[in-house]
Structures are given as structure tokens and as C-alpha cells.
Design a protein with these regions (language model features):
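N-terminal secretory/targeting leader peptides
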Residues: 1-163
Length: 163
């Protein structure tokens, strides 16, 4: 909580960060000069509390719902993973439907995705407090979690190959 607000990916170099089991996450962290540490999700909060890890690859909403906000001082928006939800249906079942019903399922799935994404985006600001400035009475505001939104120029340093 006593560190300056992160404004550069380089400020995170050398930190130990919980990484999911994905190769993409590990590779992305290595490209940012972070030290990816495989830690089970259920052990992440204890790792943060005990100082075994400096941070975690996760989303702001996960910090809020997993009650990590009391031990997190900053939420740094690195924009290297998207937060996607998945809902599936058996292809055999879908293929057995008549054409108009398949169209209705596809339209319903699309509209459900639009609605849930809009609700998630609103909750990030109104409930979690993942905004600058933060709204009062959000989980981040109540726990003094600062949000660090890096500039587009800063993000391009790591994510855009300008060759």
C-alpha cells in the first residue's frame, strides 16, 4: 500500500505473480519480465497475505468476489487477457433442431451474451470500483484498492510489434 501507483509495466519487472495453468499466461508474463508462479486459485489469497507472491493474474471482479480486496493495494489493468464467459450446447442436440429453432437459439445466445457483458461492465464500475475516479461505496473504495490504468503508449511498448 505504500508503493507509488504503477504507471509502467517495467515497474512490475521481477515481481512474483500467480499465473493460471495456461501457457499463454506464462509466456505473456515472461514477455513482461514478470516471474510467473503457478499457484492454485484457492491458495492465492494466502500467498498474497504471506508475501509469497507479489500479485496475481486475475480480473478485478475476481479480486472482489474472492475477498482479496483487503490484501490487494493496486489493480493494474494490463489488458493481456480478456475475461470471457462460456456457455455451451451439445452439437448433436443443436443439429437435431429444425432450422428456425436453430436460428432462435443462436439469436437468444447472442442477446444473452450482450446482456451479460453489459451487466458485467456496469458491475466493474458500480460494484467493484474498477474505474478512475472510483465511485464511493464500491469494494475497491472501501478497501483502498487503487486502480492503475496504463496509457495506450505504455501498453504498446509491450504488446505491439512495430517491426
Amino acid at each position: 500500500k505504500d508503493r507509488d501507483l504503477v504507471t509502467s509495466i517495467d515497474q512490475l519487472a521481477g515481481t512474483k505473480n500467480r499465473v493460471t495453468g495456461t501457457q499463454l499466461g506464462r509466456i505473456a508474463m515472461q514477455l513482461m519480465n514478470l516471474n510467473p508462479v503457478p499457484v492454485a486459485w484457492e491458495e492465492t489469497i494466502d500467498g498474497l497475505k504471506q508475501g509469497l507472491i507479489d500479485g496475481a493474474e486475475t480480473w478485478a471482479s475476481a479480486v472482489a468476489y474472492a475477498n482479496m480486496a483487503p490484501v490487494v493495494s493496486q489493480s493494474v489493468d494490463l489488458r493481456f487477457f480478456s475475461g470471457n464467459e462460456h456457455c455451451g450446447m451439445s452439437s448433436k442436440v443443436f443439429d437435431s433442431l429444425d432450422g428456425p429453432l436453430q436460428d432462435a437459439v443462436m439469436e437468444s445466445a447472442y442477446l444473452a451474451q450482450v446482456q451479460s457483458q453489459a451487466a458485467n461492465e456496469a458491475a466493474l464500475i458500480k460494484t467493484v470500483g474498477f474505474s478512475d475516479p472510483q465511485l464511493p461505496d464500491t469494494i475497491f473504495a472501501e478497501n483502498n484498492v487503487r486502480t492503475a490504468f496504463l496509457s495506450d503508449e505504455e501498453l504498446k511498448k509491450k504488446w505491439v510489434d512495430e517491426r
